[in-house]
Amino acid sequence: MKGFIDDANYSVGLLDEGTNLGNVIDNYVYEHTLTGKNAFFVGDLGKIVKKHSQWQNVVAQIKPFYMVKCNSTPAVLEILAALGTGFACSTKNEMALVQELGVSPENIIYTSPCKQASQIKYAAKVGVNIMTCDNEVELKKIARNHPNAKVLLHIATEDNIGGEDGNMKFGTTLKNCRHLLECAKELDVQIIGVKFHISSACKEYQVYVHALSDARCVFDMAGEFGFTMNMLDIGGGFTGTEIQLEEVNHVISPLLDIYFPEGSGIQIISEPGSYYVSSAFTLAVNIIAKKVVENDKLSSGVEKNGSDEPAFVYYMNDGVYGSFASKLSEDLNTVPEVHKKYKEDEPLFTSSLWGPSCDELDQIVESCLLPELSVGDWLIFDNMGADSLHGPSAFSDTQRPAIYFMMSLSDWYEMQDAGITSDAMMKNFFFAPSCIQLSQEDNFSTEA
């Protein structure tokens, strides 16, 4: 079942109904404890199939174009290609990756807001014509390097998550759209639609109301210049929960019926990323060092159990220069699960979790409550499939984590029922032997 981040020769173990994700993790914790204690991922590809079914059930009118930069492992891309999604690519390498899987150029969008001229030329060479743009400089660059480009104007939204300027970093204003349409007409660049993006952290779904209204205005404006508009891209921003997907759909569905009704010839698309992959990957890390500190030395992110109790700082064999890279740009609001069994009445201590680099930025969890751990113990982080599976940074000399892919037989049958028969992908599946079952009495040593 092992693979690596960019390994096209991965394998996927099919698990019988008596084996679950916990059994798989137990098995590989045991194996890694004996062989080297390296961090590792377990990827449940069945969860990606389930997410696609959920998407089809709730927002079937919107075609997903998966955001490749979120998780570009070959196993993920192959299964999404087999499911029939499109792909949103931000680099030449990402375009090449999905085209190697036989994905049609019509199902690829070049989404980088700041495009290198050579990469625009590459897109033109391989037939990737649809791309986004939000300013005059990019428009002129596209005109010079891609004669067949079909451009989506990226408009800003009122999503203020992430700072006072919010989503204004990318996306043009409604006022500036007329100028860009004039430029496109002069440059003979084809404008075919509009894109906007709303952060998954945004809870004010009224933002969609304004964004869709603005998009309709741009469509009407483009019609004045003679452009034939046929695509609306509502971006990403989907967390992965069915509730959030239904809430967003509840807001946008009636507006789409009003502004972009069925039969109008306008294709509605989106760019989900973490929606598909976040919950599909679990990361297991090992405690490599430990330090006892005074309780008040740690930040007061959790309630103290008593001023005389110690607090613990733990260092793990993976950090922000590896699988937790997204921690550098966003908060990681998660408390890991302790792999070893401990008693319900075992005392919990204020704890802080750090990566191995000794860099002050390499703090993974500022403060949480955990039982006292030992060097060699394992911690399990769920929902690690998005923006985590990158090669190690030059700052870190740690080995990149292996990925163990799995799928339950029930998910396998569901995939067959969905008509997925890609020979290239099917050759990677095999029936896995039952995982090692460790009882509570099995107490193998974890000390380094």
Curated annotation (Swiss-Prot):
Subunit structure: Monomer. Interacts with OAZ1 and OAZ3; this interaction disrupts the interaction between the antizyme and ODC1.
Purpose of the protein: Antizyme inhibitor (AZI) protein that positively regulates ornithine decarboxylase (ODC) activity and polyamine uptake. AZI is an enzymatically inactive ODC homolog that counteracts the negative effect of ODC antizymes (AZs) OAZ1, OAZ2 and OAZ3 on ODC activity by competing with ODC for antizyme-binding. Inhibits antizyme-dependent ODC degradation and releases ODC monomers from their inactive complex with antizymes, leading to formation of the catalytically active ODC homodimer and restoring polyamine production.
Entry superkingdom: Eukaryota
Segments crossing the lipid bilayer: none
Keyword Lyase listed: no
InterPro entries per record: Ala_racemase/Decarboxylase_C (IPR009006), Azin1 (IPR031178), De-COase2_C (IPR022643), De-COase2_CS (IPR022657), De-COase2_N (IPR022644), Orn/DAP/Arg_de-COase (IPR000183), Orn_de-COase (IPR002433), PLP-binding_barrel (IPR029066)
Keywords: Nucleus, Polyamine biosynthesis, Ubl conjugation
Gene Ontology CC annotations of this record: centrosome; cytoplasm; nucleus
Marked site positions, Not modified: K69
CDD domains, A to Z: PLPDE_III_ODC_like_AZI
Localisation per UniProt entry: Nucleus
Organism placement in taxonomy: Eukaryota, Metazoa, Chordata, Craniata, Vertebrata
GO molecular-function terms, A-Z: ornithine decarboxylase activator activity; ornithine decarboxylase activity
Record protein name field: Antizyme inhibitor 1
GO term, biological process aspect, one: estrous cycle
UniProt source species: Rattus norvegicus
